[in-house]
């Protein structure tokens, strides 16, 4: 005796079978693609020189890799000018000497503190323009060898041991930075 199945039950089984076949077909196509796609080969790592490229193009902007002795602000400025970046958002990590600033509203200037040999756990900021020159604005969090963390506005950053990696996401519109007369500080205009 054969058990009669409900039509919805048969339809569900059919849909499962079709879904499984499609998934197997997609997986097979991906595997075939992976087997035929050439893999990137990289040259052996060498010590950087002045001629060593500091950035490469990505689908959304650029990836920078700075090395010992590089100044993050100088390299970002060079990139913005060379690639005619209208504006951008930046994120990064790295190791080096950082000068943090804390805005003193009474002085309308930064109180600065230099930290040497720290690990930048996070860097975030923007690239805009002021007086036809790139204006880089970065904040970050740094940790030292005792695992103490410090953070704030980054006034300067020089890479020491290791490297600094910065992702630059380019925006289509040129943004300008200017002095806000109410607070006396640079502010991004949108």
For each predicted feature, which ranges?
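N-terminal secretory signal peptides that target proteins for export/translocation
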Residues: 1-10
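Sec-dependent N-terminal signal peptides
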Residues: 10-22
């Amino acid at each position: 005796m054969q058990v009669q199945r409900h039509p919805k039950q048969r339809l569900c089984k059919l849909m499962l079978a079709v879904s499984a076949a499609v998934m197997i077909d997609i997986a097979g196509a991906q595997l075939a693609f992976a087997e035929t796609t050439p893999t990137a080969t990289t040259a052996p790592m060498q010590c950087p020189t002045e001629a060593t490229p500091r950035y490469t193009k990505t689908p959304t902007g650029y990836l920078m890799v700075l090395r010992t002795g590089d100044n993050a602000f100088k390299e970002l400025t060079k990139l913005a000018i060379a690639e005619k970046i209208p504006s951008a958002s930046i994120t990064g990590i790295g190791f080096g000497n950082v000068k943090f600033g804390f805005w003193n509203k009474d002085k309308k200037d930064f109180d600065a503190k230099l930290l040497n040999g720290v690990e930048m756990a996070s860097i975030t900021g923007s690239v805009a323009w002021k007086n036809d020159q790139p204006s880089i604005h970065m904040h970050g969090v740094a940790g030292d060898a005792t695992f103490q963390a410090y953070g704030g506005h980054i006034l300067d950053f020089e890479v020491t041991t290791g490297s600094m990696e910065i992702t630059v996401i380019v925006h289509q519109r040129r943004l300008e930075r200017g002095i806000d007369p109410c607070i006396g500080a640079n502010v991004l205009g949108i």
